[in-house]
């Protein structure tokens, strides 16, 4: 995701639930940031450029979900970068993200934090365990 700095980069997170142990994230699917692209519907106009916003291309998301179904994986959430910001979700991130998903944020100095977005659209820190 850092390759597109100073713009925000994004990726889809795929994996599967583990019985009583949380989620196994075993596929990071890089996608293009389509924020502001003329051929993609923009639900939030006037909110700035790709330096502070991202939008996953719906076609890329469908391709990832198809691959996931074929490989017993499901969409767990989205990763994106805050090149000049903190590793916590912005108010825009919280408004635009689907609830009951993982949100992983990487900043410009390499810090990473994962979050669980609940039904109430509040982000709660989610521990990461590397296997």
Question: Which sequence ranges carry the predicted segments?
Answer:
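Conserved beta-strand-loop surface patch within small alpha/beta domains used
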Residues: 1-75, 83-131
